[in-house]
């Protein structure tokens, strides 16, 4: 059987564009997906596009989503992902994200600097909502993922501290 469903891309249905409250269709649809997940004991993953005007924002949070409050309300976990800008991997740039890996030494975790290959394809993942731990806004930490688009593989390689602000 199945234990995970990926719904790509979660958005307002065309038939709902005539309504003055398009956000209600997102709430309704998210609740239907939630019911299905609970009924069949499924992990339900739904991708949602970031609002276009948020392109260039470095530190992502739920405000990047249209209808953010309604969308976030129903979710158990919310992860936000974006492309990594070249400036974020350049140590001389004011946007450098300071990638690191955790290494255990004498029962203590220390941060070990990580040099990200600037020629690789990278994505940055922000934990916006979790019911079981800290989120990126609490810690200032996001995850650096190496992306292999040919095989749709994301590998968690390091953590980082993205800057707040925008790149245009």
Could you describe each region identified by the protein language model?
Residues 1-6, 32-40, 52-168:
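C-terminal regions of RecA-like/P-loop NTPase motor modules
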Residues 14-27, 56-63:
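Flexible beta-alpha connector loops of hexameric P-loop NTPases
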Residues 46-49:
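Conserved H-loop
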């Amino acid at each position: 059987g199945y234990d995970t469903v990926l719904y790509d891309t979660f958005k307002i249905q065309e038939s709902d564009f005539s309504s003055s409250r398009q956000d209600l269709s997102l709430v309704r649809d998210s609740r239907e997906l939630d019911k299905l997940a609970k009924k069949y004991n499924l992990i339900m993953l739904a991708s949602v596009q970031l609002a276009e005007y948020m392109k260039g924002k470095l530190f992502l949070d739920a405000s990047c989503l249209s209808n953010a409050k309604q969308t976030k309300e129903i979710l158990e976990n919310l992860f936000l992902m974006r492309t990594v800008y070249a400036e974020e991997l350049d140590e001389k740039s004011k946007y450098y994200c300071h990638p690191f890996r955790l290494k255990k030494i004498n029962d203590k975790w220390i941060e070990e600097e990580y040099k990200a290959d600037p020629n690789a394809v990278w994505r940055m993942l922000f934990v916006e909502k979790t019911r079981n731990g800290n989120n990126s806004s609490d810690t200032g930490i996001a995850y650096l993922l190496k992306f292999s688009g040919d095989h749709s593989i994301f590998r968690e390689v390091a953590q980082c501290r993205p800057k707040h602000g925008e790149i245009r």
